[in-house]
Regions:
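Terminal transmembrane helix and immediately flanking juxtamembrane interfaces
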Residues: 1-211
């Protein structure tokens, strides 16, 4: 990375572009500690969203300027580089899409699932990370504001859609709506239980009923 200087400004830029990796690491560690598959479902959703984002990249074909910072190559997805022309597509922004997807996927379930408590500090933190990412990418010429806006739009729509898919499939336990709220108590309506009773006399079955 030519001309790189270790400074507070460069560290801020570097951490801003590393935000997607930090989010993945945090959610993976959360799943390891809690021994659940939530991070796997989340990563599957981000993979689908990335494919949709790459589709729009090839549709728009907005290329990154030659004087873009080397920091822009920290978070590079396959198929986002035009190998024939050696050009990198920059819209919709992949990092903005990723953070926005995470924001929607975590925030929306909090509003529509018990205990219906939104973790305001978490939502504000993710929103702040998104703003920092947009500013850092623009300053480093990784993309323009339109690319960041489109990435944010694609990410939020895909995050909401992925939540809807998981929620409607009956696997609400794989969502994050209760993990990051202050109240961990969740009440659900108990499911019906059935009992099968068999009546025998002298070793012969007289009656069988289900209660």
């Amino acid at each position: 990375m030519a001309g790189f200087e270790f400074s507070a400004t460069n560290l801020f830029k570097f951490l801003g572009l590393l935000t997607p990796f930090l989010i993945i690491f945090f959610l993976l560690m959360s799943s390891v500690i809690n021994q659940d598959l939530k991070a796997l479902i989340y990563l599957l959703g981000t993979s689908v969203a990335s494919l949709v984002n790459i589709f729009f990249m090839y549709l728009i074909k907005s290329t990154r300027p030659d004087d873009a910072s080397p920091f822009c190559n920290v978070f590079t997805f396959p198929f986002t580089v035009n190998s024939e022309a050696n050009e990198r597509y920059d819209a919709p922004s992949m990092t903005s899409m990723f953070i926005s997807f995470t924001l929607a996927y975590i925030w929306i379930p909090m509003m529509f699932n018990p205990p219906n408590t939104v973790n305001i500090p978490l939502v504000l933190t993710l929103s702040a990370l998104l703003v920092i990412d947009i500013i850092a990418q623009h300053n480093q010429k990784c993309t323009n504001f339109l690319g960041s806006f489109l990435g944010t739009l694609v990410g939020f729509v895909m995050g909401a859609a992925w939540y809807g898919l998981v929620n409607s499939s009956g696997y609400q336990s794989l969502l994050y709506y209760s993990d990051f709220t202050g109240n961990k108590t969740i009440c659900r309506r108990p499911q019906k239980e059935y009992f099968k009773c068999d009546v025998y006399k002298n070793g012969k079955l007289l009656q069988s009923s289900r209660l």
